[in-house]
């Protein structure tokens, strides 16, 4: 009888571990403050960032979810808020990024996936050490409906 309980416990544990690991990965995503009120949804597009590494390099991953029922074009510039409470903006004309996201779709930066390079930002392009990093922002984000 004890043997059956052990196997039931072991089975339940194997089901719980992957779910726990998945939850930990998702909890690392932080909202990108798009509004003065701190909201991370603008015109039906939700935005998040995550500080992590890729091939040993500190990277800011960006994720956008288009909740609209039509595609949208996003345009923005990268900005980082430092521990010294200063914004570092990349807002020269050549620094502007854009991306078209289909309706009800999520696009996110992923290590080893070069499909959306604009969603992977090198921390060293803004601060010398990741300890100086505080937050990421999609500065001057605009959401344009695509016909």
Regions found by a protein language model. Give the residues of each.
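Exposed beta-strand and adjacent loop surfaces of beta-rich binding modules
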Residues: 59, 71-75, 138-140
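Low-complexity, acidic Ser/Thr/Pro/Gly-rich terminal tails and inter-domain linkers that flank the onset
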Residues: 25-56
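Terminal connector regions
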Residues: 110-147
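Short acidic, flexible loop segments centered on an aromatic residue
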Residues: 69-87
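Intrinsically disordered, low-complexity Pro/Gly/Ser/Thr-rich segments with frequent PxxP/GP/PP motifs
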Residues: 83-125
